[in-house]
Amino acid sequence: MCGIVGIVSKNNISKNCYVALEKLEYRGYDSAGIAGLNGNKIQIFKKQGRVQCIKEFCDNANFKTAIAHTRWATHGKPCEENAHPIVSSTGECVIVHNGIIENYLEIKQNLEKCGVVFKTQTDTEVVCNLIEKETGNTLEKVKKACDKLIGSFALAVLFKGKNEIVIARKSSPIYVGSCFGGNMVASDILCFEKNAKYCALEDGEFAVVSKSKIQIYSSTLKKVKKSFKTIETSGEEIELCGFEFFMEKEINETPAVLKRIITEYQDKEKIQSAIKLFEGVKNVEIIACGTAYHAGRYGAKILQETLGLSASAHIASEFRYDKNNIKENTLAILVSQSGETADTLRAGELCKQNGYKVLAIINSMESSMSRLADVSLNIFAGKEIGVASTKAYSAMCLVFYILARYLKNSNFDTFEIEKLADQSKEVLKVDSKIVDLIKNASRVFFIGRQFDSISSLEGALKVKEISYKSAEGYPAGELKHGTLALINNGTPVFVLSTDKNMHDKTMAAAEEVRSRGGIIILISQKSFDKGCADFVINIPESEKELAPLLSVIPLQTIAFETAKAIGNNPDKPRNLAKSVTVE
């Protein structure tokens, strides 16, 4: 979840490191730091806070070899002491790390017996000192240390007097490439210059990066030849383009994203390989985390209703340890915006080990998940920077819908649903009175039935993530089984009712809330009876399977506007990071 950058060049790359870190800040923003070679010495500067806290230093530094880091704390509280880069006890090497070392306490105790004095609370300092104690050249030292580590890591190591960076990878993404007058390592290809050549390190691989060369090694330190691709990422995707926050920009990009998906998948060949995976399949297990899990719930339901398939959605961190989840003739579908979600990747690896076919629905076709899966479907959402996912959720759901329709009817044409993109433009604005209501509430509830119950979960998650309000989503029928005890005068309850067949029952639940003093914010199709609603958000008329793609947009906007009204940064909520690359 941390962001790693390293550059070795003939030029001063201090500012390049800073700019690259800014692009990685979505991965964590508890603290930031940089370490560079200054003659034969290593100079380190780090601060608690966002990346901008090291800007002045980077503007004035003169490093041609440097590593840098933006941190999301796992071991040790966010503070300057625990910020990366972390230096070894004698100062021989300095390290930046993304991941979790599970056996760090055992190694730490052994090192303390050898006289090492630790200055931080991090697991990273253990790795740094372990490397220092090993014998051999720089690569061999890193390799020997990594062999003793249990857990996940991407490491970039700088040694005193060596104009090179040693890289190691296990279960945490890391890329190498050529740019900035030399060579570079980074956690995300966003950091590279456009048209730069890059490749991903695979699990167990190492690399030594100098200004003139990138040499990749296998787990046994045999030299590996790899093909490099050209960066084609548009810089515009990571610019605000007139918006104050990325989350606002990304919500407003949803109509264009939906339009692109409809256009891209009009070409059935782009989805044909995924369709073939369903041949002979009796069970579908959809595996994901967070917002992607909610999209997986939508996907399971659309496959059940459209095809009559046995389909279930699972939280990835639980699926790995469930008993009796291995069945014959099963397809696993992994869902992830980044394609690097650690728990989903580990669950996917388990599925492969047990003979499952694996389909990935992702937003990054260069990700670890794409390489793991038999087939990957692109959600075409473009880069999503805001920590709280918005346009990617809508995109995942639409890809599931299109896949289900193609599986049911090979003659399906995506332009049958092209009005969806235009309809989504109609629900981007919300009543400021609703925002004021949520801002002043201590807790918020969301209820719905069937597809709407899934939207309720996602709406609650958005409010929770960025406004820090207590927010929960429930199936409407569950109100009487506990939740009504929490409803009193003035409690806001979002009632989602976009399915005509469920509307009367859902409104009956709304009446129960109203009778206890709750305030009803109804989201429904324009033609539906509004009953006891205090506030109404109308969505355009649409089939029940597509209505959730419309109803979720005002929920995202309300969450965004509420966070902004409170004074929170919607793009960077406390304690969270965009890409969850640790378990």
Language-model region placement:
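Short, glycine-/Ser/Thr-/acidic-enriched flexible segments
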Residues: S9-I13, G39-K41, G49-R50, W72-T74, ...
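Generic C-terminus detector
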Residues: S542-E583
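Glycine-rich oxoanion-binding loops at beta->alpha junctions
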Residues: K64, A68-E81, I261-A274, A300-V335, ...
